[in-house]
Amino acid sequence: MKLTCMMIVAVLFLTAWTFVTADSRNGLEYLFPKAHYEMNPEASKLNKKRDCVAGGHFCGFPKIGGPCCSGWCFFVCA
């Protein structure tokens, strides 16, 4: 019985939350104020590869993206 009441309250809360957040047409405009092309790519930390490992050096377990400058690691950076 308690679980049923909790589920009903949760569904009502989520339904109300959906209606409250969907109320504004410009909600996404304020959430994402600038388009991707308007952003400064130089300010992004994701684009900087200062601390990466050069090709031919040990990088660890095979993975994509890891510490290598190229982004490819198969025990040795590509």
From Swiss-Prot:
Keywords: Calcium channel impairing toxin, Cleavage on pair of basic residues, Disulfide bond, Ion channel impairing toxin, Knottin, Neurotoxin, Presynaptic neurotoxin, Secreted, Signal, Toxin, Voltage-gated calcium channel impairing toxin. GO terms for molecular function: calcium channel regulator activity; ion channel inhibitor activity; toxin activity. It comes from the Eukaryota. Residues 23-48 form a propeptide. Disulfide bonds join 52-69, 59-73, 68-77. It is found in: Secreted. One of its GO terms (cellular component) is host cell presynaptic membrane. Expressed by the venom duct. Coiled coil: none annotated. InterPro entries: Conotoxin, Conotoxin_omega-typ_CS. The keyword NAD does not apply. Residues 1-22 form the signal peptide. The presence of a 'disulfide through disulfide knot' structurally defines this protein as a knottin. The cysteine framework is VI/VII (C-C-CC-C-C). Belongs to the conotoxin O1 superfamily. Omega-conotoxins act at presynaptic membranes, they bind and block voltage-gated calcium channels (Cav). This is Omega-conotoxin-like VnMKLT1-0111. It comes from Conus ventricosus.
